[in-house]
């Protein structure tokens, strides 16, 4: 339910300054942005967000709007491609419209990729590298690491962490700490931040670090963190977990308050 509420809120933001803009108005003004998507109730929220994103990219085809559209296309496509596999026994046209929506998403993603090949937008650069194996795009992004658009964007920082995770664990940890520093009050970081930190620390036998962030992950509601191996390691070393539990609680609270500071000498 919380996810759906966030989607609706995002849709309102996409509507921009004109808070009277409704989905029906968009579809009436630009029916082509609605008619080539699925017609049934599947992926309702993703479909609505995509329609708004298409409209705003059409009205103002900036790199930022193209990036937003690309993200919404991928989100919608993930949903509708799954839904397209659900066969309607009585209503074959529903399955057909889902396939149409899937094909529309693929076509539009190809268009955005082609139109943004020369872009310097950090998000688009990462997409070109991760989706199309464009090493030139990734090199551009790596050369922009001191750019405020990169340094102050938690999503882009997480992209960089995913890249460095393959080649440099120390750099990856620094970037993941930066993601936590950028976390806004009341927000919960992407669970991948915690799972990556736990994995790296465990690999390097920094068990206290691994345990602390595994507990932070649990406090944040992350369910797929396996804390048992690191707990067993610490128990075999005779370590008292109470102090680490307290540290984890303080760390969690600082992250949730938007006040986390990278523990350089952790």
Q: For the regions a protein language model found, what residue spans apply to each?
A:
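Sec-dependent signal peptide recognition
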Residues: 2-9
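C-terminal motif of bacterial Sec signal peptides marking the signal peptidase cleavage site
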Residues: 13-16
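N-terminal Sec/ER secretory leader and immediately downstream segment
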Residues: 20-122
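Alpha-helical adaptor scaffolds
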Residues: 122-202
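Alpha-helical positions within canonical tetratricopeptide repeat
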Residues: 136, 171-174, 209, 243, ...
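Boundary/linker segments of alpha-helical solenoid repeat arrays
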Residues: 152-156, 184-193, 218-231, 259-263
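TPR/TPR-like (Sel1-like) alpha-helical repeat modules
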Residues: 205-223, 248-256
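Terminal, low-structured helical/coil segments at or just beyond the last alpha-helical repeat
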Residues: 226-266
